[in-house]
């Protein structure tokens, strides 16, 4: 969801999960645990990734995933929504029964940090002690700030942030990130790195809402990097979005299937280049994929389902090994697809995590992933690789 899905949250006390400071300090210089039966895991594929040193997060993640059942691996690939005003207990059975690994706080959480902290702590209580939840939210600033009230600063819009120096913005982002961390949020689905190329008012998802930094691609990259680094200073992960940019479409993918064909963006162009620079310089926790279609890149698939963009460019060209997450799978832009195949198509393209903005989408997406993986060994290998990337992120963040 272009305006909703910027989501991931973790339990309040940062020290409680033993954050891996080395990863969070990277600069631009470049017990409810279950013991699965052997018969459930021995035949499952290993992650198809290079063999890392045994103490590196990737190696630890491989070991963790090798001990998981298929259903547990699939659960790591799903982010479920908790809406403002909803009781966290409404997700208890979903998290435990489906082995869900991530949650997102959606809506107008306007009663302050204590309310959020209580909710995130309750959510974490449903997860195994050795595999805590990623908990995210959209906290961009301006019109897209889901958490407000005592304990959360009123954040300026991204356009206003674009008038700040990079150093000042990094410092401010560190403050905002510290507020998120104290409330139990560990991933901020920000910053938006799209570059608006035409009339701002006619660009419904970004320009009309002042969600970009209001600069050229180079300036947007510089300010996006500052936000990523500021959040990392606060031990909060960032999700750059919406790759490769929504600045050249007129329609908002959350609400329409019209006006979401980008006819100008290319992988070698400045707009996608802003993302590429931020990704290669900061190695963000996540890259969120756009739901628009890019005529000059892959005219047959939205970016979220494009192996050309994810496997071909983000994975192979940029060498990004982090988590690739969808924008909201329940957005109108994807309404023509079979819900049970949404997560499948993301993983087939090289992606990892389905961000879900509507509760009734969760079960069919989970079931679709499980059914395909059980019948298709090649797809099961992709599930294993995706779960390994998610677990590597959790290990870096001290969640597993």
Model-derived regions: residue spans:
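Second-shell residues forming the walls of enzyme active-site clefts
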Residues: 69, 114-123, 219-378
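Short, acidic/polar
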Residues: 84-96, 168-179, 272-277, 338-345
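Hydrophobic faces of well-ordered beta-strands that scaffold small-molecule active sites
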Residues: 75-82, 101-105, 133-139, 187-191, ...
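Mid-to-C-terminal alpha-helical segments outside catalytic/metal-binding sites
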Residues: 377-400
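Second-shell loop/turn segments in exported
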Residues: 47-52, 80-85, 105-111, 157-171, ...
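Solvent-exposed loop/turn segments at secondary-structure junctions
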Residues: 83-87, 108-112, 139-144, 187, ...
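Glycine-rich, aromatic-flanked loop segments that form ligand/cofactor-binding clefts
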Residues: 126-152, 172-198, 220-244
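N-terminal hydrophobic targeting/anchoring segments and the immediately downstream early-domain regions
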Residues: 1-27, 31-134, 142-145
């Amino acid at each position: 969801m272009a305006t909703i899905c910027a989501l991931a949250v973790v339990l309040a006390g940062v020290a409680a999960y033993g954050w891996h400071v080395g990863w969070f300090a990277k600069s631009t210089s470049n017990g409810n645990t279950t013991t699965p039966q052997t018969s459930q895991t021995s035949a499952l594929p290993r992650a198809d990734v290079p063999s890392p040193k045994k103490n590196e997060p990737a190696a630890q993640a491989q070991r963790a995933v090798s001990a998981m059942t298929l259903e547990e691996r699939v659960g790591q690939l799903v982010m479920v929504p908790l809406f403002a005003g909803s009781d966290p207990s409404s997700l208890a059975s979903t998290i435990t029964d489906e082995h869900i690994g991530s949650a997102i706080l959606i809506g107008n959480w306007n009663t302050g940090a204590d309310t959020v902290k209580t909710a995130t702590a309750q959510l974490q209580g449903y997860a195994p002690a050795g595999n805590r939840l990623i908990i995210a939210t959209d906290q961009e600033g301006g019109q897209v700030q889901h958490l407000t009230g005592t304990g959360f600063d009123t954040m300026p819009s991204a356009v206003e942030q674009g008038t700040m120096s990079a150093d000042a913005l990094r410092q401010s982002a560190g403050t905002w990130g510290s507020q998120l961390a104290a409330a139990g949020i560990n991933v901020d689905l920000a910053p938006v790195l799209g570059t608006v190329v035409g009339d701002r008012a006619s660009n419904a998802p970004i320009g009309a809402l002042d969600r970009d930094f209001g600069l050229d691609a180079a300036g947007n990259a510089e300010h996006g990097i500052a936000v990523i680094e500021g959040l990392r200073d606060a031990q909060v992960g960032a999700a750059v979005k919406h790759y490769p940019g929504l600045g050249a479409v007129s329609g908002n993918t959350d609400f329409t299937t019209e006006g979401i064909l980008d006819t100008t963006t290319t992988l070698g162009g400045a707009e996608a280049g802003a993302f590429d620079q931020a990704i290669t310089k900061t190695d963000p926790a996540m890259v969120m994929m756009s739901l628009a279609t890019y005529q000059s890149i892959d005219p047959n698939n939205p970016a979220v389902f494009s192996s050309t963009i994810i496997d071909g460019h983000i994975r192979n060209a940029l060498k990004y090994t982090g988590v690739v997450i969808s924008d909201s799978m329940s957005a109108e832009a994807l309404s023509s697809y079979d819900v049970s195949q949404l997560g499948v198509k993301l993983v087939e393209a090289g992606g990892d995590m389905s961000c879900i903005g509507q509760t009734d989408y969760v079960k069919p997406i989970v079931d679709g992933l499980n059914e395909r993986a059980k019948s298709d060994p090649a797809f099961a290998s992709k599930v294993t690789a995706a779960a390994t990337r998610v677990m590597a992120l959790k290990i870096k963040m001290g969640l597993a």
